[in-house]
Amino acid sequence: MIKAIIVYPNKPGSRFDADYYLNVHMPMAARLLGPAMKAVTAEIGVDGGTPGQAPAFAAIAAFTCESVEDFMLAFKPVSDQLQKDIPKYTDIEPIIQFNNLIEFPAK
């Protein structure tokens, strides 16, 4: 299982419309990527490591699926549509990373 994460570094003077991102872009991404995604989540930064410090990331999206190949098979056909939507909510250049997902039981 892998998790594709897309992070938006929080930079001074940057623009990020969390309302549009959460209510338009992410639901569209989940719908377009379809059943290959086992889970789709979004997080909005609220604070940094020190109280009052700006968060390192304006937002983080996570897409869980079986493999990088499965993600790419779902993403490639809709990538233009998703990428053209980015300027509607931000001027931040997103960073994408694929991670192996290791789960630990909570006690």
Question: What are the residue ranges of the model-derived segments?
Answer:
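Macromolecular interaction modules
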Residues: 1-107
